[in-house]
Amino acid sequence: MSSSVAVCNSPVFSPSSSLFCNKPLNTSPAHETLTLSLSHLNPPVSSTSPSAASPTSPFCLRLLKPPAKLGFGSDSGPGSILKRKRPTTLDIPVAPVGIAAPISNADTPREESRAVEREGDGYSVYCKRGKREAMEDRFSAITNLQGDPKQAIFGVYDGHGGPTAAEFAAKNLCSNILGEIVGGRNESKIEEAVKRGYLATDSEFLKEKNVKGGSCCVTALISDGNLVVANAGDCRAVLSVGGFAEALTSDHRPSRDDERNRIESSGGYVDTFNSVWRIQGSLAVSRGIGDAHLKQWIISEPEINILRINPQHEFLILASDGLWDKVSNQEAVDIARPFCKGTDQKRKPLLACKKLVDLSVSRGSLDDISVMLIQLCHLF
């Protein structure tokens, strides 16, 4: 098993407190996919939409039938290496679309439409729009995989240059990962399958007509007692281990030496403006889905972390950088942990998500913020 990076600050709340479940969570017999998307999925998935009068409920996407067999595909070939030169600054447009509620392109999102919340089998999520006209964050969740309540896959997606790429990733990335995974337990095969799922989603998005923008992604697959976390970009996964925060992902930004070296060796240019490192004077993240105009440098290959879930693993936080730019890993665990204690009736994980979002906003965040909390005691 690959190891994770521990953040060793002492938690405010005693790590010795037990967060074990007293009883299992009831689960629905069907797969459930949740996104903030505004359009239907392709077959074999159908969607149902809430009314426009219910802005706090995202679209519910339900898988009609679990896959009979999960198979492997082929790897993508390597990209070409371009000659390095300093280009002009590129502007990323922002698409004028609505947020979670189904509103017209011409409408200005209403104040009550700025937040979206959802609770499902073993997880809660809360998203709040920042100062942009359009909400660019998305999320997805598929639980009860193949009829097993202890198997699930989750994702949080942070779009830039409009919500199109994040919406596409929310609809397709987790399904693509599942389509690549064989039901076996071989760790190397699972890691390779997750990688191919990311690469396939990126390739499919770039084939769409008039695509623009991109999206950072973080996903968490839970299967057979294993936790498989992957990321491309600066969405982050943080695990509470007995009250201590462990970052299971590393942000992909051009300020990282290895990322900057990769970009420059491929002919790209990295510089800093107002203390922010950017690629080609434009983008501040170095991996993700989309970004066709920077594709030779913005790769979609994820970094992957696999570990065996044990009783000390209490809950997992997946969140966009709207949270992590203002709230540290340990702070997030300390704030969420009291709401994850006790019996199912006493737990309030959705309130924990809201508390984290509100803290980031109170510290000056102007970005979209999405926080998903996954209670691992239900899933191992």
Swiss-Prot record:
UniProt signal peptide: none
GO molecular function terms attached to this record: metal ion binding; protein serine/threonine phosphatase activity
CDD domains: PP2Cc
Enzyme class: hydrolase
Reactions accelerated catalytically: O-phospho-L-seryl-[protein] + H2O = L-seryl-[protein] + phosphate; O-phospho-L-threonyl-[protein] + H2O = L-threonyl-[protein] + phosphate
EC number: 3.1.3.16
Keywords tagged on the record: Hydrolase, Magnesium, Manganese, Metal-binding, Protein phosphatase
Record-listed Mn(2+) 2 binding positions: 158, 321, 367
Domain PPM-type phosphatase: 122-376
Cofactors demanded by this protein: Mg(2+); Mn(2+)
Record-linked SUPFAM superfamilies: PP2C-like
Co-factor remark: Binds 2 magnesium or manganese ions per subunit.
Residues binding Mn(2+) 1, per UniProt: 158-159
Matches recorded under InterPro entries: PP2C, PP2C_BS, PPM-type-like_dom_sf, PPM-type_phosphatase-like_dom
Pfam families registered for this protein in UniProt: PP2C
Family: Belongs to the PP2C family.
Annotated protein name in UniProt: Probable protein phosphatase 2C 2
Species of the source: Arabidopsis thaliana
